[in-house]
């Protein structure tokens, strides 16, 4: 094979080049200018002929939006790490093959950097420059393009290694333990020596590696299952038994706990929406039970933040999909705890930057890259991210031996979510003897080795090269393909071919396959060389144990293999049958290449008889001083608190994540017309036709554990309850919790503290409240150690419990938000003080910003009061008695009130006289409680409800809401604090601005920051020129044959369900059509009246968003003809939305009347943008927008490449002259705009929807299908009932037929 190089488009925008040059200057490198462009390296099986080269060059021409320069100067080429295959490569190669380029073996991409230099670089300068250009965990720097052949080097398969314990004894195993990074404990090594001596043979490296992964703390939770002796006294229960006690006390509504990849609870009976085997989407009335899971991915995120967090989210999504016999992930949550950010030029008074080991990323780098990784995976998979938390902590505090640093050098990266599952699919099936054992998903690669064992070690205990080996690689588009297969399977009901399914996570197949057959009470016989592999030189250990992502293991009965194969082929999801289930509980892995058995073990050696841990520990107490508040000024204190990340505005973490996909999001983080990120709870509808739903909320108060372990745990549970209380759930037993425990096991005092905290929750608080914890996770190695200039250093995380609460929702429309209302007449603000006046300041945000800890933290004062509070809120919510609700948490009462005022774009006047004598304690304590806004006309009835629940005595009337721009706090007649709300809002927004300035286009960051300062911003609004509640298709109901529409999707598309639902509601028969159906002739576009190309990430947006999809049509003669005929047929309609818009714009050459259409390129911000944007509908001659001209209304936006790009000024002028610009982004005053974020992508004159000349073909970047129901709009006017404003677009299409 030979490698050919093709130049690509410029890789970096001007501001990215400027940033790079500034970094070079910062390190005093002699560089005067820099330019970067993509290089494509194509490995050919045989030489391409001229027309194939032309086709390939067209394929590799994409995304050219920056100025192209002639490459010149000193060159360095950054490529994916040699020996790995990037996900970009996998998808680009797929596109080439689907375009008929069968001679292409693989395509890889690099970036060539060209530097003008004043003199030759020294070796040290060159090393610095390379560090600036690449991530050593993921990338390689080449000196010349001829070295690109290294990217395609294939080696001969490596052989097994045998560890000679029969002759070398335990010492041989100890050497292997260190060399392979197995993290085996002493008793485990004794066990292995004993086991293999009894088998009379030496172990192979793969067997030891498999054992280490399968029995790591990460996978087997040995500490939570251990026996405990504390202060010399044997404890009755393990940690896990105390957690299980919550289920034993309150099993109500739980369908599955502790035995599967996720827990399941009862959901609502609704009309679930999916296609039947004939391809037509239909409603299926059935229970949509709720599954829940929350994972952590801390170690990989510390080592390489983007892929670490991405694969964290991906692994949790797989856990959900692999529940029962297959389930559907629905909505996600994310959380991060890191040390202090220390943002350049934004350093804060409480931040004293400490050093860190080189092998881990800084807190700032983690919070720039990790949220992008997590969001990117969720976005591309098609799961909305609706909830999260973000905490920073790093401080020297008192310890049992002087001072020590507590913080999150080893971060917490939390990924979780909910999904739905059919009742009959909740329990896994039996695995019959002879069942086919299958790996579904991508090929094995030599990455992510040892993740389970590495995650189980304190950061610093493993070798850096082992950290390097445990980095993983994400390919969410592949996971989407696999999920589509799983969906097709469970949608078959009783005919579901999946009997048993697990995801492949830590330990790779070495953990997943033994777990699969063990759980099915079987053994397995496997063929190593049947496993799909992208790297032929891998050893048996590397093939069996690597953690290549996006894979599942399944058991399928032999008679159903043909059906399963057909489903995979349609979705283009790779799979391999690698073995069969056996009656004997024995594991055999045969290697046909070397004709040996790398594994030949009884299952009980691997999983059955491993030693049980006993932990003998001492409890410790630390003396702490009370908070010193002398000299602290209220104004300065509040400004500091508003800048503390746990309190500050977190828009930079939210708008990078899709929050509208599925069309079932009823409450995301952004609240009200001003889209302020202060929601307490995330809410989804259970289906596309129901008001039943699901809710998620979180609770986390980890700094409190530095003062009181059990109080921290109780507060986490209680805060999750006060967060979720503002939606309509019913009895508290309906709420189920996930508990994620992070601890530095073995650190003095932490083990006993962990036991105390688990007992407080599992044995006491949750049983008293009737709460169940059916799922959770532990991470027991939260300590970082390193040597700095010969000095031993360490940073230890506080005991951290993150509680995620999940519940069925009776009516999603009743969900309250913190938005204060000024349009509801006179109203009052009430504080329900569950802290009962204790006003403790220990471990608060106030303490943190003054580099203190304090001594007494908040706690649950009375458990019954918490229950009464929840029940009272449920009554008030159900009866629509409240206008706004917000719990008191980080930052205290003053923050609660400020966030409510920000959301309402209004002022408040409150008097704190009744709350205590100490102003700082009253305003900044973080005791449990909530502020409610009540219309004065409802005040008496609300008081009656509070009285009935014994809360009136702890309820205090604070003051009123005002329509002006003042935030005022008084004590009687004395004004304590008075400031413009808009100025406080600006301070609160500084963190987001600073992070966006570093991460995104600084010009966009500046524009958004300025927009937030505007006290006169009108917020979102809607003006419709038609009646939103009129169904213009009503005369067609039940009359005649419905027109059919092809709901067209390609691999990676994710918005087809809601699109089909919108067209079905408008009166179409919606048919699921995959591009593979058209390619092989299962379907033909001639069958359909209309076609819609749906949104998502076809081919992961590789080769330009929508570009690969379009080129697979243009370069396929059969598809080219089929699409051409459809477009010229005057009796058809076509719609393209988001990715479908991008794709159809690339088909302009075969669509009549599109000669002036633009292409769509990367957003000006260079960031995926998920926003609610205002658009104006123009007067165009198009059936799609009939009767809508002059309207302006909100719409969901979710894209990374939505900026229009014209070939010339003349083309742009031609488009305007033709009058086919259907919609434009407008600002909150109604004027078309190019300012960010009202215009989320920077398109000229706000262009966002276009038609062809005769109006039959329309393309648009925003998502009307996600907001066709009023309830799925983040904000909408109250006179909208069931239908959203965009339902008219779909009904307009129906009027044609």
From Swiss-Prot:
<feature type="active site">
    <location>
        <position position="1265"/>
    </location>
</feature>
<feature type="region of interest" description="Disordered">
    <location>
        <begin position="303"/>
        <end position="329"/>
    </location>
</feature>
<dbReference type="GO" id="GO:0004642">
    <property type="term" value="F:phosphoribosylformylglycinamidine synthase activity"/>
</dbReference>
<dbReference type="GO" id="GO:0046872">
    <property type="term" value="F:metal ion binding"/>
</dbReference>
<dbReference type="Pfam" id="PF18076">
    <property type="entry name" value="FGAR-AT_N"/>
</dbReference>
<feature type="binding site">
    <location>
        <position position="889"/>
    </location>
    <ligand>
        <name>ATP</name>
    </ligand>
</feature>
<feature type="binding site">
    <location>
        <begin position="308"/>
        <end position="319"/>
    </location>
    <ligand>
        <name>ATP</name>
    </ligand>
</feature>
<feature type="active site">
    <location>
        <position position="1263"/>
    </location>
</feature>
<comment type="subunit">
    <text>Monomer.</text>
</comment>
<keyword id="KW-0658">Purine biosynthesis</keyword>
<dbReference type="InterPro" id="IPR036676">
    <property type="entry name" value="PurM-like_C_sf"/>
</dbReference>
<dbReference type="GO" id="GO:0006189">
    <property type="term" value="P:'de novo' IMP biosynthetic process"/>
</dbReference>
<feature type="binding site">
    <location>
        <position position="723"/>
    </location>
    <ligand>
        <name>Mg(2+)</name>
    </ligand>
</feature>
<dbReference type="InterPro" id="IPR055181">
    <property type="entry name" value="FGAR-AT_PurM_N-like"/>
</dbReference>
<keyword id="KW-0067">ATP-binding</keyword>
<feature type="binding site">
    <location>
        <position position="887"/>
    </location>
    <ligand>
        <name>Mg(2+)</name>
    </ligand>
</feature>
<dbReference type="InterPro" id="IPR036921">
    <property type="entry name" value="PurM-like_N_sf"/>
</dbReference>
<comment type="function">
    <text>Phosphoribosylformylglycinamidine synthase involved in the purines biosynthetic pathway. Catalyzes the ATP-dependent conversion of formylglycinamide ribonucleotide (FGAR) and glutamine to yield formylglycinamidine ribonucleotide (FGAM) and glutamate.</text>
</comment>
<dbReference type="Pfam" id="PF18072">
    <property type="entry name" value="FGAR-AT_linker"/>
</dbReference>
<feature type="binding site">
    <location>
        <position position="719"/>
    </location>
    <ligand>
        <name>Mg(2+)</name>
    </ligand>
</feature>
<protein>
    <recommendedName>
        <fullName>Phosphoribosylformylglycinamidine synthase</fullName>
        <ecNumber>6.3.5.3</ecNumber>
    </recommendedName>
</protein>
<dbReference type="InterPro" id="IPR010073">
    <property type="entry name" value="PurL_large"/>
</dbReference>
<keyword id="KW-0547">Nucleotide-binding</keyword>
<dbReference type="Pfam" id="PF13507">
    <property type="entry name" value="GATase_5"/>
</dbReference>
<feature type="active site" description="Nucleophile">
    <location>
        <position position="1138"/>
    </location>
</feature>
<dbReference type="InterPro" id="IPR029062">
    <property type="entry name" value="Class_I_gatase-like"/>
</dbReference>
<dbReference type="InterPro" id="IPR041609">
    <property type="entry name" value="PurL_linker"/>
</dbReference>
<dbReference type="InterPro" id="IPR040707">
    <property type="entry name" value="FGAR-AT_N"/>
</dbReference>
<comment type="pathway">
    <text>Purine metabolism; IMP biosynthesis via de novo pathway; 5-amino-1-(5-phospho-D-ribosyl)imidazole from N(2)-formyl-N(1)-(5-phospho-D-ribosyl)glycinamide: step 1/2.</text>
</comment>
<dbReference type="GO" id="GO:0005524">
    <property type="term" value="F:ATP binding"/>
</dbReference>
<dbReference type="InterPro" id="IPR036604">
    <property type="entry name" value="PurS-like_sf"/>
</dbReference>
<keyword id="KW-0479">Metal-binding</keyword>
<keyword id="KW-0315">Glutamine amidotransferase</keyword>
<dbReference type="GO" id="GO:0005737">
    <property type="term" value="C:cytoplasm"/>
</dbReference>
<feature type="domain" description="Glutamine amidotransferase type-1">
    <location>
        <begin position="1045"/>
        <end position="1297"/>
    </location>
</feature>
<feature type="binding site">
    <location>
        <position position="680"/>
    </location>
    <ligand>
        <name>Mg(2+)</name>
    </ligand>
</feature>
<keyword id="KW-0436">Ligase</keyword>
<dbReference type="Pfam" id="PF02769">
    <property type="entry name" value="AIRS_C"/>
</dbReference>
<dbReference type="Pfam" id="PF22689">
    <property type="entry name" value="FGAR-AT_PurM_N-like"/>
</dbReference>
<keyword id="KW-0460">Magnesium</keyword>
<keyword id="KW-0963">Cytoplasm</keyword>
<comment type="similarity">
    <text>In the N-terminal section; belongs to the FGAMS family.</text>
</comment>
């Amino acid at each position: 094979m030979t490698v050919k190089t093709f130049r690509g488009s410029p890789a970096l925008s001007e501001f990215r080049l400027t940033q790079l040059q500034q970094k070079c200057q910062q390190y005093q490198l002699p560089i005067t200018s820099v330019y970067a462009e993509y290089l494509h390296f194509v490995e050919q099986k045989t030489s391409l002929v001229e027309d194939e080269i032309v086709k390939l060059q067209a394929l590799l021409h994409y995304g050219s939006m920056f100025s192209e320069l002639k490459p010149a100067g000193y060159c360095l080429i950054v490529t994916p790490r040699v020996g790995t295959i990037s996900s970009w490569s996998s998808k680009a190669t797929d596109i080439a093959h689907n375009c008929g380029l069968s001679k292409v073996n693989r395509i890889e991409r690099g970036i060539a950097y060209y530097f003008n230099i004043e003199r030759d670089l020294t070796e040290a300068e060159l090393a610095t420059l390379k560090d600036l250009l690449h991530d050593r965990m993921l990338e390689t720097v080449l000196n010349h393009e001829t070295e690109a052949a290294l990217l395609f080097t294939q080696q001969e398969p490596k052989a097994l290694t045998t560890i000679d314990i029969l002759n070398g004894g335990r010492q041989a195993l100890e050497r292997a333990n260190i060399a392979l990074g197995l993290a085996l404990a002493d008793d485990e090594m004794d066990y292995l020596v004993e086991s293999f001596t009894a088998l009379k043979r030496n172990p192979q490296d793969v067997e030891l590696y498999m054992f280490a992964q399968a029995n790591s703390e990460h996978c087997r939770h040995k500490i939570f299952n251990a026996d405990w002796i504390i202060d010399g006294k044997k404890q009755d229960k393990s940690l896990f038994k105390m957690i299980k006690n919550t289920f034993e006390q309150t099993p109500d509504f739980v369908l599955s706990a502790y035995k599967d990849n996720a827990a399941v609870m009862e959901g609502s009976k609704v009309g679930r929406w999916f296609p039947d085997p004939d391809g037509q989407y239909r409603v299926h009335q059935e229970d949509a039970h709720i599954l829940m899971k929350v994972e952590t991915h801390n170690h990989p995120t510390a080592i390489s933040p983007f892929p670490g967090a991405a694969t964290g989210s991906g692994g949790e999504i797989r856990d959900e999909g692999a529940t029962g016999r297959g389930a559907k992930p629905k909505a996600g949550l994310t959380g991060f705890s890191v040390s202090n950010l220390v943002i350049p030029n934004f350093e804060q008074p409480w931040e004293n930057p400490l050093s860190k080991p080189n092998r881990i990323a800084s807190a700032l780098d983690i919070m720039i890259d990790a949220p992008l990784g997590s969001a990117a995976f969720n976005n591309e998979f098609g799961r909305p991210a609706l909830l999260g938390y973000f905490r920073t902590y790093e401080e020297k505090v008192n310890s049992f031996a002087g001072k020590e640093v507590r913080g999150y050098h080893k971060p917490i990266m939390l990924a979780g979510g909910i999904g739905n599952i059919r009742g009959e699919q909740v329990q896994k099936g039996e695995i019959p003897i002879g069942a086919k054992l299958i790996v579904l998903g991508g090929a094995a690669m030599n990455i992510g080795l040892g993740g389970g064992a590495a995650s189980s070690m304190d950061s610093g205990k493993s070798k850096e090269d082992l950290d390097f080996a445990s980095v993983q690689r994400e390919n969410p588009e592949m996971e989407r393909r696999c999920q589509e297969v799983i969906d097709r399977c469970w949608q078959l009901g009783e005919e579901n071919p999946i009997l048993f399914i697990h995801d492949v996570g830590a330990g790779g197949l070495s953990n997943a396959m033994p777990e699969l057959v063990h759980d099915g009470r079987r053994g397995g016989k496997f063929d190593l060389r049947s496993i799909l592999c992208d790297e032929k030189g891998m050893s048996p250990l590397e093939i069996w144990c690597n953690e290549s992502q996006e894979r599942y293991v399944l058991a399928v009965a032999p008679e159903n293999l043909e059906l399963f194969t057909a489903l995979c082929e349609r979705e283009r999801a790779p799979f391999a049958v690698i073995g069969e289930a056996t009656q004997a509980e024995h594991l055999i892995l045969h290697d046909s290449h070397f004709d040996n058995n790398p594994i030949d073990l009884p299952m009980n050696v691997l999983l059955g008889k491993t030693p049980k841990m006993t932990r003998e520990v001492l409890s410790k107490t630390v003396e702490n001083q009370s908070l010193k508040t002398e000299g602290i000024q209220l104004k300065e204190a509040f400004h500091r608190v508003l800048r503390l990340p746990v309190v500050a505005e977190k828009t930079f973490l939210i708008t990078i994540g899709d929050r509208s996909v599925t069309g079932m999001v009823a409450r995301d983080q952004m609240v009200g017309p001003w889209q302020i990120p202060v929601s307490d709870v995330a809410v989804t509808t259970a289906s596309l036709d129901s008001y039943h739903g699901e809710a998620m909320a979180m609770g986390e108060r980890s700094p409190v554990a530095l003062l009181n372990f059990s109080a921290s745990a109780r507060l986490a549970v209680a805060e999750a309850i006060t967060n979720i209380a503002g939606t309509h759930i019913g009895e508290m037993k309906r709420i189920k919790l996930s508990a994620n425990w992070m601890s530095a096991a073995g650190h003095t005092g932490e083990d006993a503290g962990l036991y105390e905290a688990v007992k407080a929750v599992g044995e006491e608080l949750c049983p008293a409240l009737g709460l169940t914890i059916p799922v959770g996770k532990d991470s027991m190695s939260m300590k970082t150690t390193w040597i700095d200039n010969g000095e031993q250093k360490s940073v230890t995380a506080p005991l951290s419990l993150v509680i995620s609460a999940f519940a069925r929702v009776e009516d999603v429309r009743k969900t309250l938000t913190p938005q204060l209302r000024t349009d509801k007449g006179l109203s009052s603000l009430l504080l329900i003080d569950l802290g009962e006046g204790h006003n403790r300041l220990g471990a608060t945000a106030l303490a943190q910003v003054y580099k203190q800890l304090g001594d007494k933290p908040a706690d649950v004062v009375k458990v019954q009061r918490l229950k009464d509070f929840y029940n009272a809120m449920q009554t008030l919510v159900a009866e629509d008695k409240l206008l706004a609700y917000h719990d008191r948490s980080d930052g205290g009462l003053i923050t609660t009130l400020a966030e409510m005022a920000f959301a309402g774009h209004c002022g408040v006047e409150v008097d704190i006289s009744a709350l205590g004598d100490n102003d700082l304690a009253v305003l900044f304590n973080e005791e449990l409680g909530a502020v409610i806004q009540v219309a004065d006309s409802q005040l008496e009835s609300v008081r009656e409800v509070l009285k009935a629940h014994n809360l009136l005595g702890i309820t205090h009337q604070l003051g009123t809401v005002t329509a002006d721009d003042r935030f005022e706090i008084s004590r009687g007649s004395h004004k304590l604090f008075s400031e413009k709300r808009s100025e406080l809002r600006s301070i609160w927004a500084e963190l987001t601005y600073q992070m966006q300035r570093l991460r995104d286009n600084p010009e966009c960051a500046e524009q958004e920051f300025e927009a937030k300062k505007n006290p006169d911003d009108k917020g979102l609004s809607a003006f419709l020129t038609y009646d939103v509640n009129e169904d213009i298709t009503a005369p067609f109901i039940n009359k005649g044959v419905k027109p059919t529409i092809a709901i067209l999707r390609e691999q990676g598309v994710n918005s087809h369900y809601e699109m089909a639902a919108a067209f079905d509601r408008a009166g179409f028969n919606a048919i699921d059509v995959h591009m593979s159906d058209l390619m092989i002739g299962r379907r033909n576009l001639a069958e359909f009246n209309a076609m819609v190309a749906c949104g998502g990430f076809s081919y992961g947006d590789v080769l330009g968003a929508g570009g690969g999809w379009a080129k697979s049509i243009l370069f396929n003669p059969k598809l080219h003809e089929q699409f051409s005929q459809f477009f010229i047929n005057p009796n058809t309609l076509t719609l393209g939305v988001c990715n479908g818009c991008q794709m159809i714009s690339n088909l302009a050459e075969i669509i009549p009347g599109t000669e002036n259409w633009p292409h769509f390129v990367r957003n000006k911000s260079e960031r995926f943008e998920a926003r609610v944007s205002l658009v104006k509908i123009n007067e165009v001659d198009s059936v799609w927008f009939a009767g809508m001209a002059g309207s302006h209304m909100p719409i969901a936006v979710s894209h990374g490449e939505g900026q229009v790009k014209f070939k010339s000024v003349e083309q742009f002028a031609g488009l305007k002259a033709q009058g086919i610009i259907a919609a434009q982004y407008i600002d909150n005053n109604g004027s078309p705009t190019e300012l960010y974020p009202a215009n989320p992508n920077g398109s000229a004159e706000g262009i966002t929807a276009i038609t062809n000349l005769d109006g039959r073909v329309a393309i648009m970047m925003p998502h009307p299908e996600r907001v066709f129901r009023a309830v799925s709009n983040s904000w909408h006017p109250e006179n909208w009932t069931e239908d959203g404003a965009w339902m008219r677009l779909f009904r307009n299409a129906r009027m044609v037929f």
